[in-house]
Amino acid sequence: RTDLYELSRQWGDLVKRSRSKQLQPEEYSTGTFTLSNLGMFGVDRFDAILPPGTGAILAVAASRPTVVAGKDGSIAVKRQMQVNLTADHRVIYGADGAAFLKDLAELIETRTESLAM
């Protein structure tokens, strides 16, 4: 198992080598899970297309200030972002994908310190 810090270091190396066009095809042509982050370009919603050989892809959009109603009926402005999971149901059971999104939402909404790299 890889912890979050090691994953961050590995990700940083992949990004660096990708930007310098040093990745080999086998490093980006297959995988079990892909993350597509167009949020860093200000895109606030999109659907990511599942690449062949991939079990699922998570589309992460930009966060935006949004007017929301509180549980008590109050009105507030909160930052919200859209994420969208596309999964190959031959590989990933839909209920597992839904549970993943629920856990991700809880992490983002209540435990933001877990997301810092």
Question: Where on the chain are the PLM-derived regions?
Answer:
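C-terminal catalytic/motor cores of large multi-domain enzyme assemblies
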Residues: 1-117
